[in-house]
Amino acid sequence: MKNKAQRLACIDIGSNAIKYRQYRISSQKSKTFAELDTFKRISVRLGTDAFKFKKISSETEQKLLESIIKLKEKADKKDIKIISGIATSAMRTVSNGDKICKKITKKTDIEIKILSGNEEAQLLNFFNYKSFKKEETLVVDIGGGSTEIFYQASGKNLAKSFPLGAVRILEKKDSPKHWVNLKEWLTKIPSENIKNIVGVGGNARLINEIINKHDRRSSIDELRSLKKELENKNFEEKVSFYSLPEDRADILEHAIAIFVEIMEFFPNSCLFDSSWNIADAVIEKKLQENKNIQAA
């Protein structure tokens, strides 16, 4: 018997926030696919504890647990039968990540998988390119603790994760050798080919909203200019002048620094943003692996 599931959800425990994405399962011509139904972002910054102390404090752990319990309660009310949970850079950095994930499972029945950097980068393989040509596109996910990059051309995939993220840089826990590693890896990609740097996640969307809200693309010079502006403003000015969320106001310039570093290798490129998220990849992967899931 097929397991009928009208909705699936994914909880993504990041370094700067918890992201919850809920999907409606649809079928068309014998193909089952997921459509984003609703999403929620909860500001719980694990990265400060993770990158400064290599351990999640009891206070931060409590905030995390309470937030996920509330999400689970809401999911249960909507009869969401299957929930996938992933954790990324902050959780794989700390000494008590496994213990916390087991505690979450015990309290909510949600299994949380701590992704390796490589696993996180490989999920970008599920990115929906839409109008972007694959051979001209670099998919980049800059989070609070790490940056994942994916390139696909002529049947060849290049995927890599680097421990360079906006919160990590804010806390001055980025290492010069990781910047060197990023530069060396980027030389594997034909620089003249890349026209589109597609940023997935909230940092890229915020950057393009500020620079070019209607066209949704930004040049490297525009990014450099915005970075300089942000560096010359205090926290309150960033929030009020740019309407930045408080939990991004202190890190956006650091996300821009990573984008600039990448774009310097690709002189013909512009930064685009996408609403796609690695949670979409997790759900798509689950649908491919479990053929018993279908639309209700």
PLM regions: where:
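Conserved ATP-binding subdomain of kinase catalytic cores across diverse folds
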Residues: 31-45, 69, 75-76, 84
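A short acidic Gly-Thr/Ser loop motif
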Residues: 11-17, 140-147, 200-203, 277
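Short solvent-exposed loop/turn micro-motifs enriched in small/polar/acidic residues
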Residues: 2-4, 132-133, 142
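Preference for bulky hydrophobic residues occupying beta-strand positions
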Residues: 11, 42-44, 140, 149, ...
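Helical "lid/coupling" subdomains associated with nucleotide-phosphate turnover
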Residues: 8, 22, 49-80, 88-136, ...
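N-terminal basic/disordered segments at the start of proteins
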Residues: 2-34
